[in-house]
Design a protein with these regions (language model features):
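Helix-to-loop junction immediately C-terminal to a conserved catalytic motif
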Residues: 71
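Conserved catalytic motifs of ABC-family nucleotide-binding domains
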Residues: 183
Length: 270
């Protein structure tokens, strides 16, 4: 059994900046209430450019609520969400601002079949995003579609297929390509490999690692699986307790030890 680490200093409130001096994402004092229920309370973290963070917890721990607030599907009761220097925690009615927010943060859900239009091929799905966010002419869009299809490891036949003709792993690759078409700084992966079998899961995780190296996108991984966290992320926070640890080591700890961390406690691993 691994040696129990001793607590380190309090959790830092200011994330490390990216290469350009601005963090890809900063979350400060985030709180979400649903009536009398407090789903998320005083969450703060940050991700540098090309960094990755896992939000770990069991069902009902608030991890998906955090993700939904970051992407803009829920409004926080209190707190600030900054992406690329822009405040996402405030509502906006400007179509231009909404498109900019879409270029800053994208999300890939657990079940791609329910998030893909069953009437659209992979090519058409990606083309729709390119037209919305970039407004490029058709020839440039076709070239970018081909690049993205190749990046996620699909072939020309699969690119022309409808979602029902693709496997679960192939549909997830389409969903990843669609998200990347907006050229986001941050990509949220909400249990995105949980429904895949182990071999396909490993392929998608390896793909995501390669994409991060190539595009410098930052990842937020929502997961209950510490093995997945260990493979893809640099650090992790426990959603209900807000405990921070290096993910490469935390997968070696007993799960009850990880959940028992005090709020704000930081663990240092050798």
């Amino acid at each position: 059994m691994p040696e129990t680490p001793s607590p380190g200093p309090p959790m830092p409130k200011t994330p490390a900046p990216g290469a350009n001096g601005t963090a890809a994402l900063e979350v400060m004092g985030l709180r979400k209430e649903f009536g009398p229920l407090v789903a998320v309370d005083d969450v703060s973290f940050g991700i540098p450019e090309a960094g990755s963070l896992a939000i770990v917890g069991e069902s009902g721990s608030g991890k998906t609520t955090i993700a939904r607030m970051i992407v803009g599907l829920e409004r926080p009761t209190r707190g600030t969400i900054m992406a690329c220097g822009h405040d996402r925690s405030r509502p906006t009615r400007s179509a231009r601002a909404r498109r900019r927010r879409g270029r800053e943060v994208q999300i890939v859900f657990q079940d791609p079949y329910t998030s893909l239009d069953p009437r659209q091929s992979a090519e058409a799905t990606i083309d729709e995003v390119l037209r919305l966010h970039h407004g490029w002419p058709a020839d440039r869009r076709r070239a970018r579609i081909a690049e993205l299809i190749d990046l996620v490891g699909l072939d020309a036949r699969q690119a022309r297929a409808l979602p029902r003709a693709l496997s679960g792993g192939q549909r997830q690759r389409v969903a990843i390509a669609r998200a990347l078409a907006a050229e986001p700084r941050v990509l949220i992966l909400d249990e995105s490999v949980a429904a895949l079998d182990v071999s396909i899961q490993a392929q998608v995780l390896n793909l995501l690692a390669d994409i991060r190296d190539e595009t410098r996108v930052s990842y937020i991984l929502i997961s209950h699986d510490l093995a997945v966290v260990r493979q893809l992320t640099d650090e992790a926070i426990d959603a209900p307790l807000i405990a921070l640890a290096h993910a490469l080591s935390v997968a070696g700890l007993p799960a009850d030890r990880f959940r028992a961390l005090a709020p704000g406690e930081v663990l240092e691993f050798q």
